[in-house]
Amino acid sequence: MGTNDALTSTEDAVTAGANDAPLPAPPEPPRKARRATSRTSDFRVAEQPAYVLHSYPYRETSLIIDVLTRDHGRLALVAKGAKRPHSALRGVLQTFQPLLLSWSGKSEVRTLTGAEWVGGMLPLGGDGLLCGFYANELLVKFCAREDPQPPLFNHYVLTLTRLAHGEPAVQVLRSFERVLLRETGYAMALNRTVARRAVEPDRRYVFDPERGVRNADDEVPSHWPVISGQTLLDMEQDDYHRAQTVAQSKTLMRFLLNTYLGGTPLATRQILIDLQNL
């Protein structure tokens, strides 16, 4: 499958890895995202399952790493000395690899005290790598700091595993996007309308970003994409074997993600557009 068909919500592309060109500074999460309390405490956490989403230089020899952890949500950690040539952290703090991280501190940016590579994850390549960078960017933009979301963490691991094994990127990404929206407060059923009527496969609908599925015959903004009932039912079941469902689900998710991000562009999308223009 080609990259154009695989990547969604902006036809994404490769973005920076853990030690490559940085992503833009993460914006505030969308307004519906659940926010953790502002309380911080001086504590130590040992051997927490985690993945590096992104990193950027800090001072001369260190890195700030943006990580997704299983039980503590998304965090920023300072990895002191990680840029030094002989640092043991250089080869460990890589994206898409399962880690056990330890940290301490009471500030918003905690101090990394240990990092262990767990292993067992196949490396991503080709379209799978592009999709992985796309998933990381969505997590950075949608997830509030210190908001534990174990189901989202587990689905992220599943997403990487499926991509590494070469499963169709279209289905893998659509599934990830829906879980991401659900866990960050945007979940709405696709099999029932806002009037609580069952979606019919032969009818035409639109998706109101604030309310859910509505009849296409209603008075709605013209830029809302029209989606068949069959596509909505297929998406509810995570079924993407129909060509129409593949095309319409991509259009719908692009529209919803763009709306919830307030029109903020994704770096992965622009990189792919630039590559296609070569």
Curated annotation (Swiss-Prot):
Gene Ontology cellular-component terms listed: bacterial nucleoid
Q: Does the keyword DNA damage apply?
A: yes
Compositional bias of kind Polar residues: 1-12
Residues passing through the membrane, by range: none
Alphabetical keyword list: DNA damage, DNA recombination, DNA repair
Matching Pfam families:
RecO_C, RecO_N
Biological process per Gene Ontology, one example term: DNA recombination
Hydrolase among keywords:
no
Q: Which domain of life is it from?
A: Bacteria
Which InterPro entries does this chain map to?
Answer: ARFGAP/RecO, DNA_rep/recomb_RecO_N, NA-bd_OB-fold, RecO, RecO_C
Residue ranges of the region described as Disordered: 1-42
Q: What does this protein do?
A: Involved in DNA repair and RecF pathway recombination.
The record's comment on protein family reads: Belongs to the RecO family.
Q: Could you tell me which HAMAP family the record lists for this protein?
A: RecO
- The protein's name: DNA repair protein RecO
Name its species. Burkholderia lata (strain ATCC 17760 / DSM 23089 / LMG 22485 / NCIMB 9086 / R18194 / 383)
